[in-house]
């Protein structure tokens, strides 16, 4: 038996529609004490998932809103329990009054993520689907939303479950051979087992290979802005951000630390990192900033080398350019096209050279095109992209264990030795979907949700 929980699913801000979400045994009957149908019939008389008009009352029995509600009976609901939703006008006062009336009717306040936790515990979804709910809420681009929606529908589980189930069958056979040596069981087939485990390892490798693209879709392409002082790095960040994110002055060395800002560039989510201008300096604080600029290149996806095109290249420009070319991808941005250009593009060893004016905004369509070419949309965002670090870690551990099992087979070791590695692989892979559940992991996952989800 589960207790009755309630929450404002849409937050307490003033909105067009506000939703009270309910779940638990007996919640439909209890909700009927607070929401009365216009028909005069009890709320429990409604068929599942059919909206009906009614009135919401506060704890003193006073009407506070004319709204709609629907019910879903177990097990055909989000949580797998009896559930109800009351859809009001988005008045914080009305929603709060309705919630307090529900508490008086025997409900308690839902904890963060409790509706989705109940869905997981009741078998309505696995952990990958639960985590994808958060990703879908947080998605900032169409690609991120599409990938998260695919995972909510079970895309990762559909890849993991066949591998896990195959390992279960192998383990069962190994145990049968070991536990019943006198029975007429098929003999230990080295080549058959090795082929099966090797194939599953390849499938895990393919899934892990999608991590890099998945991270960029979900969290953004990390683009580090490099250049000498006063080349226009901070002005570039402000232009792409659409507001003055950082201070811009004519004084060299104004930016002394890295500054991050997430922006949308066409279909791309981009995490811009503005850095201190690269130059030799005696200022201790600025020197630390320059060192951080050099460090930022090491884990970026692309470096944006910004240079003032109205002046000849300096030694400081060349030092920044060399740092940018250490990145996996690099784009040269010839800034200040509103002035007379003096730099020859042939002097810059970049595949992508974009002339722009951060002052008036010209050339930024070309920068977007460069991102399209560097980061093509060549992988379908259907849920198959692995975006979650926890899941990737568990899959990597599973792959290492199954690879160890293959090596044991090739070395001619006995089935019990192979079983140790294979069962370790199963434990790790089971963590991905929650088959092998660790409470500390699930607590951490659902704590990330807001109340009402």
Each language-model region and where it sits:
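A glycine-rich (often HGG/GG-containing) alpha/beta subdomain
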Residues: 1-146, 150, 154, 331
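C-terminal-of-GTPase-core extension/linker across diverse P-loop GTPases
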Residues: 3-8, 12, 142-264, 281-283, ...
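Conserved catalytic network of the ASCE P-loop NTPase/AAA+ motor domain
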Residues: 12, 62, 76, 126, ...
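Switch I (G2) and immediately adjacent beta-strands of P-loop GTPase domains
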Residues: 53-64, 69-73, 253-281, 299
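Generic enzyme active-site microenvironment
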Residues: 272, 306, 333
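Short alpha-helix of the ABC ATPase nucleotide-binding domain corresponding to the H-loop/switch region
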Residues: 278, 286-290, 318
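Inter-motif core of Ras-like GTPase G domains
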Residues: 286-310
């Amino acid at each position: 038996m589960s207790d009755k929980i309630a929450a404002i699913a849409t937050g307490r801000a003033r909105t067009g529609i506000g939703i009270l979400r309910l779940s638990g045994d007996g919640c439909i009957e209890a909700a009927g004490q607070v929401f009365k149908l216009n028909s005069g019939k009890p709320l429990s008389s409604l068929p599942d998932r059919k909206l009906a008009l009614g009135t919401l009352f506060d704890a003193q029995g006073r009407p506070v809103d004319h709204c709609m509600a629907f019910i879903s009976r177990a097990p055909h609901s989000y949580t797998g329990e009896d559930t109800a939703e009351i859809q009001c006008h988005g008045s914080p006062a009305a929603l709060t009054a309705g919630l307090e009336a529900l508490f008086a009717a025997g409900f308690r306040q839902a904890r963060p993520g409790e509706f989705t936790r109940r869905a997981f515990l009741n078998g309505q979804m696995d952990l990958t689907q639960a985590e994808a709910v958060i990703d879908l809420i947080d998605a900032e681009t169409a690609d991120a939303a599409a990938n998260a929606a695919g995972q909510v529908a079970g895309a990762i589980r559909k890849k993991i479950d066949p591998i896990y189930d195959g390992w279960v069958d192998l383990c069962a056979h190994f145990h049968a051979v070991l536990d019943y040596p006198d029975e007429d069981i098929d003999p230990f087939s080295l080549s058959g087992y090795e082929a099966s485990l090797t194939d599953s390892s390849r499938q895990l490798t393919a899934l892990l290979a999608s991590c890099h693209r998945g991270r960029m879709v979900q969290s953004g392409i990390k683009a580090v802005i490099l250049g000498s002082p006063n080349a226009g790095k901070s002005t570039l960040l402000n232009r792409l951000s659409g507001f003055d994110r950082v201070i811009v002055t004519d004084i060299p060395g104004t930016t002394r630390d890295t500054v991050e800002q997430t922006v949308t560039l066409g279909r791309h989510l981009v995490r811009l990192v503005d850095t201190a201008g690269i130059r030799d300096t005696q200022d201790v604080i600025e020197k630390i900033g320059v060192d951080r600029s050099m460090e930022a290149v090491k884990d970026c996806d692309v470096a944006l080398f910004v240079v003032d095109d109205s002046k000849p290249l300096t030694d400081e420009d060349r030092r920044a350019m060399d740092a940018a070319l250490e990145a996996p991808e690099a784009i040269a941005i010839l800034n200040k096209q509103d002035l007379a250009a003096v730099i020859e593009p042939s002097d810059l060893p970049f595949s992508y050279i974009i002339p722009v004016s951060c002052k008036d905004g010209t050339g930024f369509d070309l920068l977007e095109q460069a991102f399209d070419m560097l980061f093509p949309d060549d992988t379908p965002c259907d849920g198959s992209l692995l975006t979650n670090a926890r899941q990737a870690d568990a899959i990597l551990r599973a792959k290492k264990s199954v690879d160890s099992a293959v090596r044991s087979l090739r070395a001619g070791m006995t089935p019990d030795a192979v079983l140790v590695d294979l069962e370790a692989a199963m434990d790790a892979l089971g963590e991905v979907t929650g088959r092998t559940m660790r409470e500390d992991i699930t607590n951490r996952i659902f704590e990330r949700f807001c109340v009402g989800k």
